[in-house]
Each structure stands twice: as C-alpha cells, then as structure tokens.
C-alpha cells in the first residue's frame, strides 16, 4: 500500500535502549546522509528503521510495541516500509519473522551493510567515525569497543553483541577530532566493558593510553568513563584521571551485588572484600571521584540475609550516584537454569528501599555542596531554568544543576562557574558567576540606500 501523503524516500530512525544503540543509530544515519538520503524525525518519514533493545523484559516489551505501532501505520498507509535492527532482532529474528511478518526485513547488530542495501544505500568503509549525532551539540558518545567476553550469568549481551572487539586508538582519535570539529566538547566513552579495552588488539589493558591520546584533541573539554568492570580494572587509569583535567573525576562501574554467594553465582569473578578494597583504592587515589554504580536485587537465591548485606553495604559506601534494578529472568543465559524464586513484589520492594537509601545519601552529599563553586556545562533550557551538569554528572542519569533563566542569560553548550545556593536529593540550584544578566540583543540590519 502506498502512503497517503507524498513523503517519499524520507527515512525515520527510531532508537530504543541504551547509549550504545544511540551510537549505532548515529552511524547508520551518517551512512545514509553520505548516500544523500533524507533522514528525518518522528512522523515525517515514509520509511522507518527501528533500532531495538533486547536486554530485559521491559526493554523487549517496548521494542515489540514500537514495532507493532509502525506495522499498524504501514497497514493504514501512513508509512511504506518498516525495517527492524538492533539487539531484539539479533536475538529473536526467527521468532519475530514468524510473529510479525509485516515488517519488511529484520537485521542483526552486525548487518549494517545489508540494512543500508535494503535502504538503497551503499556502505562506505571510508566513513570512519562519521555519524549524524542526535545528542545535544556539546556532548557525544564514543563507543570504544563492541561486544563482551565476560561470563556474567544474568546477561544476554554476548548473545546479541558477540565477543569483545576493541576499536584501534587511532580510529577513536580520528572520530574524536571530527566530533570536536563539529562543536562537541564532551566525550562519553562507552562499551560493554571499558576494563577489557585493548586486550584483544594490544595484548594489554590500554584504556589509560587511549585517554592520554584523547586529551590531546583540541576542543574537547571533558572525557567521561561509562561501564567499567571491577575485575581486572586497570589502575593506571586513575593516574591519568588524577593528572589530566580533561578526564572527569567520574566512573560508572556496575557492581550488581556484594554478597559473596550471589557474586559467585553471577560469575562476576570478585568478592565482597575485593570489591570494597577496589572502591577504597579509587577514593584514596582520586578523592574527588564520583562513583556511579548499578545494582540488581531479586537474583535467584537472594535471601533476606543477602539483601540486608547489600543494603548495609550501600549505606557504608555512600555512592555518589546509584541505580537499582530488579532481576529479569533471561532465556539462554546461565542464570535461566536457576529458579526465579524471589517474588516480583519482593524484588520491587527491595529496589525501592535501596533507592530510598540512595536518595537520602545523595541529599546529604548535595547539602555539602552548598556554597561551593563548580564548573557547569549548560545542556538545555526548560521553562524558567537553564539545566546543566558538573563533571560529576552524566546526562540523563545523574544530578542536574538548575539556574534561574529569568535573571541571567547562558548559552547552551558553554561552561560556567556556578555557586551552589540550594540542594535537593538529585538537583542542585546555582548562581553563575561573572556572566551577563541579559540575552544579547540582535544587531539591527542596516540597509544602505542606493
């Protein structure tokens, strides 16, 4: 069926899931632009590409619902073609083809050339690092590796993304230079496992050397690290963080649990004692570091004693940033062979309690910031506030700094010294120092008479 409108050859890329998917969609859109294809936003395209997530049940449900939504639009004649790619398609392609046959074609996570061909575009190998960024202009994700070699019992990522494959340092530097040339000032380094970076290419953990090369890129102000693994963490990274002002005093390191019984069952390769020692070493070496972690509650076999151990440990460690999720029983994982024996309501109660504890910790830590001055980047304006972040905060998941937009003019993407005046549990309220109080007036256009 043909679309009701004349929107021909306009491609809408819909991205679901994590920052790695955002990056992959940006690469796809960069390739499409290089092929002179018209890439558009929601509702404007007659061709739709859905980049799905297949990590946990909620993400899978969202992906399936999105596919069904666009299939219905196709049936109604509002779009011509629907293509599906990403982790859900990689993991469940035969099932999806059977259950939702109205999708024109399904592609896995490594089938970009095939997807481009279906979109009547050529895969251009020479476009190293060139993409169409969808994040605010001041920051961008830099994916330094694909896949994962860890054997974590609960995780299906290796099924969808394959083994760990590091991107060469020179390629990443080239990509960073191109991003900086386009106005990007903050690089958020992402991978399934930053800790492993370089072992496959250089036979050693090479994250520190990568950072030393990236800090030389002109125009980059901040470099942020996301998704490290505790076992085998390269401690020389801390020395670079301490020495190089461009490397944010920030580390996202998912720890999942602290009970030795569960860490063993999860196949995390560490213990309560080793994990605590590692975190204390982080704080000793880089005292200003903000540590973000994520935890899982309700894993098979988690008893009340295991949970209490985790809860007390969270109180002891006082993480600057923390997220807590309920366990999702994923087929084809090692843990799927275990009984999912913690009731869902108990899982949710435990997650809620952990987040209540973290909210109090965050409030207490934020109160200590009142009166201090921080360098803040402005991400956007919402209503009567400019919204920014410190180097201790990543976009979307961490604290934000709110500045009254009725009293001062700030430029999105710029950095300002901001004095903190008030603090809530996850928000800071600040006053910028030494800035103009008015938005610059537009210059009048003077037309000379002839």
From Swiss-Prot:
Binding residues for [4Fe-4S] cluster 2: 148, 152, 155
Any single biological process term in GO: tRNA modification
Pfam families: Radical_SAM (PF04055), TRAM_2 (PF18693), UPF0004 (PF00919)
Cell membrane is among the record's keywords: no
UniProt remark on cofactor binding: Binds 2 [4Fe-4S] clusters. One cluster is coordinated with 3 cysteines and an exchangeable S-adenosyl-L-methionine.
Keyword list, A-Z: 4Fe-4S, Cytoplasm, Iron, Iron-sulfur, Metal-binding, S-adenosyl-L-methionine, Transferase
Catalytic activity: L-aspartate(89)-[ribosomal protein uS12]-hydrogen + (sulfur carrier)-SH + AH2 + 2 S-adenosyl-L-methionine = 3-methylsulfanyl-L-aspartate(89)-[ribosomal protein uS12]-hydrogen + (sulfur carrier)-H + 5'-deoxyadenosine + L-methionine + A + S-adenosyl-L-homocysteine + 2 H(+)
Residues bound to [4Fe-4S] cluster 1: 18, 53, 87
UniProt domain TRAM: residue ranges: 367-434
One GO cellular component term: cytosol
InterPro entries listed in its UniProt record: Elp3/MiaA/NifB-like_rSAM, Methylthiotransferase, Methylthiotransferase_CS, Methylthiotransferase_N, Methylthiotransferase_N_sf, NA-bd_OB-fold, Ribosomal_uS12_MeSTrfase_RimO, rSAM
Radical SAM core domain sequence ranges: 134-365
Enzyme Commission code(s) on record: 2.8.4.4
Main location group: cytoplasm
Localization (cell): Cytoplasm
Required co-factors: [4Fe-4S] cluster
GO MF annotation terms: 4 iron, 4 sulfur cluster binding; aspartic acid methylthiotransferase activity; metal ion binding; protein methylthiotransferase activity
CDD domains: Radical_SAM
Domain MTTase N-terminal: 9-124
SUPFAM superfamilies, A to Z: Radical SAM enzymes (SSF102114)
Keyword S-adenosyl-L-methionine: yes
Family: Belongs to the methylthiotransferase family. RimO subfamily.
Matches recorded under PANTHER family: RIBOSOMAL PROTEIN S12 METHYLTHIOTRANSFERASE RIMO, RIBOSOMAL PROTEIN US12 METHYLTHIOTRANSFERASE RIMO
NCBIfam families reported in the protein's UniProt record: 30S ribosomal protein S12 methylthiotransferase RimO, MiaB/RimO family radical SAM methylthiotransferase
Protein name, entry field: Ribosomal protein uS12 methylthiotransferase RimO
Native species: Christiangramia forsetii (strain DSM 17595 / CGMCC 1.15422 / KT0803) (Gramella forsetii)
Lineage summary: Bacteria, Pseudomonadati, Bacteroidota, Flavobacteriia, Flavobacteriales
Gene of this entry: rimO
């Amino acid at each position: 069926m043909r679309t009701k409108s004349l929107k021909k050859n306009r491609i809408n890329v819909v991205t679901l899931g994590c920052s790695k998917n955002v990056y992959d969609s940006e690469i796809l859109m960069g390739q499409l632009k290089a092929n002179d294809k018209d890439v558009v936003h929601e509702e404007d395209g007659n061709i739709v590409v859905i980049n799905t997530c297949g990590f946990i049940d909620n993400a899978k449900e969202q992906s399936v619902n999105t596919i069904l939504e666009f299939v219905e639009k196709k049936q109604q004649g509002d779009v011509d073609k629907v293509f599906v790619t990403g982790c859900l398609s990689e993991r469940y392609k035969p099932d999806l083809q059977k259950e939702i046959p109205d999708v024109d074609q399904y592609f896995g996570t490594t089938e970009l050339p095939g997807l481009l061909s279906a979109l009547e575009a050529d895969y251009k190998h020479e476009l190293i690092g060139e993409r169409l960024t969808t994040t605010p202009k001041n920051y961008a994700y830099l994916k330094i590796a694909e896949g994962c070699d860890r054997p974590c019992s609960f995780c299906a990522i290796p099924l969808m993304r394959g083994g760990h494959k590091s991107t060469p340092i020179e390629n990443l530097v080239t990509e960073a230079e191109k991003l900086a040339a386009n106005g990007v000032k903050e690089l958020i380094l992402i991978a399934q496992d930053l800790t492993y970076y370089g072992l496959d290419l250089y036979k050693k953990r090479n994250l520190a050397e990568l950072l030393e090369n990236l800090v030389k890129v002109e125009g980059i102000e901040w470099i942020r690290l996301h998704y490290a693994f505790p076992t085998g963490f390269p401690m020389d990274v801390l020395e670079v963080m301490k020495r190089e002002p461009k490397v944010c005093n920030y580390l996202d390191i998912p720890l999942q649990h602290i009970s030795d019984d569960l860490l063993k069952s999860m196949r995390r390769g560490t213990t309560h004692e080793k994990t605590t020692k590692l975190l204390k070493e982080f704080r000793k070496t880089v005292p200003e570091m903000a540590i973000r972690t994520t935890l899982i509650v309700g894993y098979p076999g988690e008893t009340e004693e295991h949970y209490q151990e985790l809860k007390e440990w969270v109180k002891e460690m006082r993480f600057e940033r923390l997220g807590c999720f309920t366990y999702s029983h994923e087929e084809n994982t090692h843990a799927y062979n275990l009984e999912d024996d913690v009731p869902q309501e108990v899982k949710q109660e435990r997650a809620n309690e952990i987040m209540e504890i973290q909210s109090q910790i965050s409030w207490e830590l934020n109160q200590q910031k009142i009166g201090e001055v921080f360098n803040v980047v402005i991400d956007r304006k919402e209503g009567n506030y400019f919204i920014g972040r410190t180097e201790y905060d990543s976009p979307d998941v961490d604290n934000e700094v709110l500045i009254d937009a009725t009293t001062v003019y700030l430029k999105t993407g710029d950095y300002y010294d901001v004095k903190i005046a008030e603090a809530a549990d996850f928000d800071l309220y600040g006053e910028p120092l030494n800035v103009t109080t008015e938005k610059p007036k537009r210059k009048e256009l003077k037309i000379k008479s002839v």
